[in-house]
């Protein structure tokens, strides 16, 4: 029997599916949402799809994409604005079978949706956000212009495509913020390296903490400094930041008077895995987030993580005894106290995180099959199957479907 939404033997033998991933960025910031593009590319190519990437041309002319559009980057945050390359956009979309538009807050993915509809192509629109408001961002850029962009650009584009959310929080957020129903796709984790050894913590050993992500207000890296500063009142600790963004200079200024703070800049995905695997724990201080890939990957590897309770973060702590390590955003005292609880019985909690990682990895492994299913052509409507588990949510045609 064949499963609706999943490729069958006859479909697997068919010609390669041509998938075009459209994203303003490919890998601009360590830990940024754009990491999905590279992940999706590798997973779909492993499933015999022919994948191309269309992106904005970065300053300097480089970019890890097959086709690039000339673009301006609007200060202060570098919002990408394509200013040319329309023939390239038209050609790339015309040659693809399926378009995956990545990110609802940028113009290029929305333009790709409009062109794809003109060219009668199937479009999947990947949502990364949780729908939570921007409480720490510029009033003019994020709250005023952002709202105008959502109403005039993002909402129409989402209604012309099939929205796909990489987080449970994003499903509810898409309904509340954009008025659309999104299909939930468990984040398709790539193969994660195992930590080389189980890290222990000696009584007088400095606690090594790693923070990975975009250095922007909504990620709140400045709070991480305050948290570790409070931890240091009880034991020695060091904090390393990996990422890029508009708060890099502010962190550098803080680091001048705090030799235990290091701002390392951006690194490759493989390098980040090594850094996280060598640390005692990873820290996330986001005030708004969705998938929380910056903690999902280390948690899936069994690495201890202290995080804020935003987006899907609470769901990543599968083992009940670990949920105390997920605290309210902005609560410096709670985060510091939780880190000290972790260090007081580090070996025991480390083993619990290892068990949690196995459960979390199994949960997100199915995201690979779901991603492949999304780009396959829908099966004929008369096909039926009894092999789908209750609660699965797959795709038929251009609309999500709930499987009873």
Task: Give residue ranges: language-model regions.
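Conserved donor-binding/catalytic core segment of Leloir-type glycosyltransferases
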Residues: 20-22, 189, 200-219, 225-228, ...
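Short alpha-helical donor nucleotide-sugar binding micro-motif in glycosyltransferases
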Residues: 93, 266, 274-279
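Aromatic "clamp/platform" in nucleotide-sugar-dependent glycosyltransferases that forms part
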Residues: 104, 287
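Membrane-proximal helix-turn-helix segments that form the acceptor-binding/catalytic region
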Residues: 118, 131, 144-162
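Nucleotide-activated donor-binding/catalytic signature segment of Leloir-type glycosyltransferases, i.e.
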Residues: 249-270
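Short hydrophobic beta-strand element within catalytic cores of glycosyltransferases
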Residues: 304-308
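Conserved acidic donor-binding segment of nucleotide-sugar-dependent glycosyltransferases
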Residues: 320-332, 342-346
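A charged, aromatic-enriched C-terminal amphipathic alpha-helix characteristic of glycosyltransferases
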Residues: 344-382, 388
């Amino acid at each position: 029997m064949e499963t609706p939404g999943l490729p069958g033997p006859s479909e697997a033998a068919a010609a390669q599916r041509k998938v075009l991933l459209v994203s303003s960025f490919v890998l601009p910031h360590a830990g940024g949402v754009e990491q999905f593009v590279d992940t999706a590319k590798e997973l779909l190519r492993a499933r015999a799809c022919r994948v191309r990437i269309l992106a904005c041309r970065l300053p300097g002319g480089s970019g890890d994409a097959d086709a690039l559009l000339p673009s301006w980057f609007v200060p202060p945050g570098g919002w990408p604005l394509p200013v040319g390359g329309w023939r390239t956009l038209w050609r790339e979309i015309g040659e693809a079978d399926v378009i995956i538009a990545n990110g609802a807050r940028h113009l290029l993915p929305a333009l790709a949706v409009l062109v794809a509809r003109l060219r009668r192509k199937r479009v999947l629109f990947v949502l990364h956000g949780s729908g939570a408001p921007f409480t720490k961002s510029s009033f003019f850029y994020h709250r005023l212009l952002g709202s105008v962009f959502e109403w005039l650009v993002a909402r129409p584009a989402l209604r012309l495509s099939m929205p796909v959310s990489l987080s449970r929080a994003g499903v509810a957020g898409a309904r509340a913020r954009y008025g659309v129903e999104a299909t939930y796709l468990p984040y398709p984790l790539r193969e994660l390296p195992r930590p080389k050894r189980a890290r222990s913590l000696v009584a007088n050993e400095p606690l090594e903490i790693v923070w990975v992500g975009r250095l922007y207000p909504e990620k709140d890296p400045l709070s991480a400094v305050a948290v570790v500063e409070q931890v240091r009142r009880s034991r020695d600790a060091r904090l390393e930041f990996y990422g890029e963004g508009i708060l890099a200079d502010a962190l550098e200024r803080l680091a001048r008077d705090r030799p235990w703070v290091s701002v390392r800049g951006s690194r490759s995905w493989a390098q980040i895995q090594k850094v996280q695997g060598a640390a005692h724990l990873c820290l996330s201080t986001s005030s708004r987030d969705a998938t929380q890939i910056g903690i999902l990957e280390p948690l899936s590897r069994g690495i201890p993580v202290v995080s804020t309770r935003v987006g899907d973060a609470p769901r990543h702590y599968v083992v009940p005894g670990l949920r105390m390590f997920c605290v309210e955003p902005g609560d410096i005292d709670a985060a510091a106290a939780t880190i000290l609880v972790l260090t007081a019985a580090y070996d025991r909690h480390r083993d619990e995180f290892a068990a949690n990682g196995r459960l979390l990895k199994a949960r997100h492994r199915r995201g690979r099959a779901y991603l492949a299913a999304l780009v396959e052509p829908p099966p004929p409507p008369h096909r039926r199957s009894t092999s789908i588990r209750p609660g699965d949510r797959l795709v038929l045609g251009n609309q999500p479907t709930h499987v009873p």
